[in-house]
Every structure is written in C-alpha cells, then in structure tokens.
C-alpha cells in the first residue's frame, strides 16, 4: 500500500475489497479440494 488512507470511508472500501478477494480465493480452493477428494472414488463394481 503506497498511498495513505485519510478517511474512514477509504479504509472501509479497502478492507471490503480485500474481503471479497479472500472470499473468492477461499471458494476456489474449497471447490478444488472438494473435486480432489471426490475424484478419487472408485466406481462401484456390480457383479
């Protein structure tokens, strides 16, 4: 962060932006992990 935050409004916008970025990254990681876990299942053999 190379510029100063002078008002509460600027601070709130900055933290809100980072919150949305982190939420998006967390969602992508969660979906990737879920696909990794469910992709390892073997097919059920029907005799």
Curated annotation (Swiss-Prot):
UniProt keyword Zinc-finger, yes or no: no
Disulfide bridge positions per record: none
Classification via InterPro entries: sulf_resp_HmcD (IPR054911)
Transmembrane segments: 18-37
GO cellular component, one term: plasma membrane
Keywords per UniProt: Cell membrane, Membrane, Transmembrane, Transmembrane helix
Localization terms from the record: Cell membrane
Chief location bin: membrane
Membrane topology, record value: Single-pass membrane protein
Lineage: superkingdom: Bacteria
Task of the protein: HMWC (high-molecular-weight cytochrome c), ORF2, ORF3, ORF4, ORF5 and ORF6 in the HMC operon form a transmembrane protein complex that allows electron flow from the periplasmic hydrogenase to the cytoplasmic enzymes that catalyze reduction of sulfates.
Name recorded for this polypeptide: Protein DVU_0533
